Amino acid sequence: MARSSSWHRMSNFMRKYRKIPHSSFKTKWNENLKQKYAMEELRSNLLTDSENASVMRTLLSSFQLHNCEPTPQAYRFVIKTLAKSSQLENISSVLYHLEVSEKFDTPESIFRDVIAAYGFSGRIEEAIEVFFKIPNFRCVPSAYTLNALLLVLVRKRQSLELVPEILVKACRMGVRLEESTFGILIDALCRIGEVDCATELVRYMSQDSVIVDPRLYSRLLSSVCKHKDSSCFDVIGYLEDLRKTRFSPGLRDYTVVMRFLVEGGRGKEVVSVLNQMKCDRVEPDLVCYTIVLQGVIADEDYPKADKLFDELLLLGLAPDVYTYNVYINGLCKQNDIEGALKMMSSMNKLGSEPNVVTYNILIKALVKAGDLSRAKTLWKEMETNGVNRNSHTFDIMISAYIEVDEVVCAHGLLEEAFNMNVFVKSSRIEEVISRLCEKGLMDQAVELLAHLV
């Protein structure tokens, strides 16, 4: 059937006058392209103008040239450029224009950059002011920018005192404190030794059902052991309190507690921590056993030390030179010098070379036992085995020679120490000078006087 003429007239009219809408994709793509060229123009202009005297004019002209509006990324780039070139006085004009002239919602990242730039340059008041003015920029502040401000404030004790007031005001603004916020505060308190306040914060987090990062517990425990009195503080009870807040101590945490107890001369308690560690199915390593050995030997519980040494061997742990030194020292304290010498011999067979500490322990024990002959043998053995003598080695032997009235030998060792640039205590030099004078060896005594100046 043939179409009517009216249909053809309508069809021609539609083809001639209908409007085809622009693709939104093409419009967005075109806008992005213009903004890209504007950013390139801005970068180029800012690099050319090293002083950035008219930074806002540069920003606006770069985007006007490409017929588009400045973007948040452009503002952030300008602020970062000013911060890097230490032109912080120009940031305020950028912020003013951003607040008054722009309409977009300003990203929080811009304020984080400004706060960091001001804060780390010592402009604390300006950093605080920027944080509280964030709502004026069509932006809702959160823990993201609050954390940036806290990181600035906690650097110094003076500005740290401002934190409580700022936290109260931030909460009134609707800022929710997150785990990361508490972490910053606890780290700062631990650093300045306010471990009791840090502990209270952790307890508050636990009661408020905030998930606490295990590393935060470890940081707190480490700080407590650093700042508390190791001779009397109940660190085991403190550890139990932390357990109640869902903390499961690991190998490093137990090691910190053990070392703290040993420093306080509390060897028996160290053993109880080792036993608790095993109950918690945390496998002790060689460092743990070495620390516990040190503690029980300091308490003169030598049977326990022997048992622990056998235990670590049965567990397949290979003692290193530090473990051997602790155990050899225990044998020497029991006057079992033969056993100590055999242990050093075993070290060589098992591939753990004795170091200067090993020799110092044995030489001192031999001197104390009056066996200067074997002490001299070990002294020579050190040189043969390539073990460098330190100031403590020289001090032990010089003192031994003075004790048996062999002042000439003591003088010889002093000269050797000076030639090797090894430090010798002034009191020891004075003692040798006094003995030389008593022997009438005035020339040698006068030579040594130069080393006291």
Curated annotation (Swiss-Prot):
Q: Transmembrane region positions?
A: none
Q: Which Pfam families match?
A: PPR (PF01535), PPR_1 (PF12854), PPR_2 (PF13041), PPR_3 (PF13812)
Native organism is Arabidopsis thaliana (Mouse-ear cress)
| The PPR repeat ranges on this chain | 107-141, 142-177, 178-212, 213-249, 250-284, 285-319, 320-354, 355-389, 390-424
The family assignment reads: Belongs to the PPR family. P subfamily.
The UniProt entry, under PANTHER family, shows: PENTATRICOPEPTIDE REPEAT-CONTAINING PROTEIN GUN1, CHLOROPLASTIC (PTHR47936:SF1), PPR_LONG DOMAIN-CONTAINING PROTEIN (PTHR47936)
Q: For this UniProt record, give its keywords in alphabetical order, as a comma-separated list.
A: Mitochondrion, Repeat, Transit peptide
Q: Where in the cell is it found?
A: Mitochondrion
Task: Name the source's superkingdom.
Answer: Eukaryota
Q: Which Gene3D superfamilies match?
A: Tetratricopeptide repeat domain
Full protein name:
Pentatricopeptide repeat-containing protein At2g38420, mitochondrial
Which InterPro entries does this one have?
Pentatricopeptide_rpt, TPR-like_helical_dom_sf
Record has Glycoprotein as a keyword: no
Q: Where is the transit peptide?
A: 1-77
Tell me the organism's taxonomic lineage.
Eukaryota, Viridiplantae, Streptophyta, Embryophyta, Tracheophyta
Give GO cellular component annotations, separated by semicolons. mitochondrion
